[in-house]
């Protein structure tokens, strides 16, 4: 019987558990795995931006600009920006009635 389905009932003015097989090793292992899964899920939801950014980009923060003249850095920035700029002519205007 799972720990999640145990029923607590008053026994002699105390709260007890009507579960005889709670010492089963499989139940203990399943409970530990469930608790670890819950902890990892909570951490994932709290830090998902940091975690997935680390997987996507690793430890690098972009190309190194050490020893590169400022004019070449600016040219590189302009090329990068022009690569992501969107031409307005590619959009289709849809008019709803």
Curated annotation (Swiss-Prot):
GO terms for biological process: protein complex oligomerization; symbiont genome entry into host cell via pore formation in plasma membrane; symbiont-mediated suppression of host autophagy. InterPro entries: Flu_M2. One of its GO terms (molecular function) is proton transmembrane transporter activity. Glycans are attached at residue 20. It is a single-pass type III membrane protein. Keywords: Disulfide bond, Glycoprotein, Host cell membrane, Host membrane, Host-virus interaction, Hydrogen ion transport, Inhibition of host autophagy by virus, Ion channel, Ion transport, Lipoprotein, Membrane, Palmitate, Phosphoprotein, Signal-anchor, Transmembrane, Transmembrane helix, Transport, Viral ion channel, Virion. The chain crosses the membrane at residues 23-43. The modification Phosphoserine is found at residues 64, 82. A lipid is attached at residue 50 (S-palmitoyl cysteine). Residues 60-84 are annotated as: Disordered. It comes from the Viruses. Residues 1-22 are virion surface. One of its GO terms (cellular component) is virion membrane. Residues 44-97 are intravirion. The record marks 41 as: Seems to be involved in pH gating. The M2 protein from most influenza A strains is inhibited by amantadine and rimantadine, resulting in viral uncoating incapacity. Emergence of amantadine-resistant variants is usually rapid. When the channel is activated, one or more imidazole moieties of His-37 probably become bi-protonated. Cytoplasmic tail plays an important role in virion assembly and morphogenesis. Belongs to the influenza viruses matrix protein M2 family. Homotetramer; composed of two disulfide-linked dimers held together by non-covalent interactions. May interact with matrix protein 1. Forms a proton-selective ion channel that is necessary for the efficient release of the viral genome during virus entry. After attaching to the cell surface, the virion enters the cell by endocytosis. Acidification of the endosome triggers M2 ion channel activity. This is Matrix protein 2. It comes from Influenza A virus (strain A/Swine/Iowa/17672/1988 H1N1). The gene is M.
